[in-house]
């Protein structure tokens, strides 16, 4: 599938950010969302452009590092999944996908789609926890 991407680019928390348009081509429906971003970044690097910065760690739906807003929804169109569990089969050929970082004062942008999660980490280090009804 061929997709248009509108990705939030921002140098740091104090810089003015903006959406930048990209295209990716021949993406398999079985590709994960983060793999699609990897494909875009490989293309950008080949063209001597700066890759899009985004967080990820386990890529197994465990750690929560990959949190993004996709088309205005946390983690994308599905519910009860993380961004790394989202696959491109949830989109249609020719779709435009808008990708943004979390918009929260507690999580300022480090760069592009990566945010500073230290406020959350401090809660965990202090012995606190965050619970979610499941």
Describe the residue ranges of each PLM region:
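Signature of N-terminal electron-transfer/Fe-S-associated modules in redox systems
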Residues: 1-134
């Amino acid at each position: 599938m061929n997709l248009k991407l509108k990705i939030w680019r921002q140098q740091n928390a104090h810089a003015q950010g903006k959406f930048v348009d990209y295209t990716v081509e021949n993406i398999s429906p079985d590709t994960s969302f983060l793999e699609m971003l990897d494909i875009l970044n490989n293309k950008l690097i080949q063209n001597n452009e700066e890759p899009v910065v985004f967080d990820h760690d386990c890529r197994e739906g465990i750690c929560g590092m990959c949190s993004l807003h996709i088309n205005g929804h946390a983690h994308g169109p599905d519910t009860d999944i993380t961004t790394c569990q989202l696959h491109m089969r949830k989109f249609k050929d020719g779709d435009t996908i808008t990708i943004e970082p979390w918009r929260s004062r507690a999580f300022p942008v480090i760069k592009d789609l990566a945010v500073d999660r230290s406020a959350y980490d401090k809660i965990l280090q202090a012995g606190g926890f965050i619970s979610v009804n499941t």
